[in-house]
């Protein structure tokens, strides 16, 4: 219905590398955005923040956060937030551990949707991975991951839980 393109849009971003160990990134966006779920044009405001830091020689941390709001004249269609944290620690050149936590949280106004939607929805995922380099071509992994949700109809529940061991070899011709 003619809602395929955005007409007015403003975006501003800033990146700074404070020193060899810290980087920050900020992006702000506002303007028209297509609401594909309801085939209409809305107004979006979004903010994305990212901060990376290396502590000492072996610890790396990544923090990210994104906020997004879509509005129409009748009200706020949704507020969405995504948070991401990753940590990496090198015990030695051959052994390291990585952990990730990601949280997704959205609040919708169901009365502003054509189809039935949940008003509140939240999910969280975690991963933990231990990696050991046996030689330049062979890696061994021990990992754990899980994923959980919570919404208007369910209490917090873990859906997927995985524990795995893997050996990877890079064949050379």
Residue ranges of each PLM-predicted region?
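Exposed, low-structure sequence patches enriched in small/polar residues
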Residues: 1-173
